[in-house]
């Protein structure tokens, strides 16, 4: 969006993205249901440009499970998915990277930020990437390349849960003082190809209850994508 605004107003602005994965989307495993509202605002003609939002959300089901039975519950309003899409979030990220590249955003896949850089006044100056090509004992190998420093007016950290640099920022700027502790969850996901007779494209099912006990938060999902594929997880 920054590049769009810079082009619109005729201003020079460089935007750089560091992606630690081998490509954008390589570390995005989610099969997700997303609202297109932000995409409508960012790229209004996303459908014409071939965004991989191929499966409109259809039937919504919310079930309470016991060990032997499933009880259908009213779907909470915040879980209604009319107008949303079932997607592979990795594919969406790859497509967004293509759109960003067309706007001359500099994207560096395979580079992880290893250090936060600071100005003399203590404010964030940017980040430095890690050295590449060191041997197992830390010495410079034949293909050694030193890390590079990236300086910016604004630096955004999108490391996900417990990011290594984000933790240092928490400590330096006391960002966790006086706030609730973070909450983490662990889950599994698989992508199944099922028989066409069993596939209901656009179907969305969420469950709560069994096999969790009554004191533990958790649940499962089943999303029917295109091509007889089902994203299933817990």
Which residues make up each language-model segment?
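Glycine-rich adenosine-cofactor-binding loop
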Residues: 1
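Short amphipathic alpha-helical segments
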Residues: 29, 76, 167-170
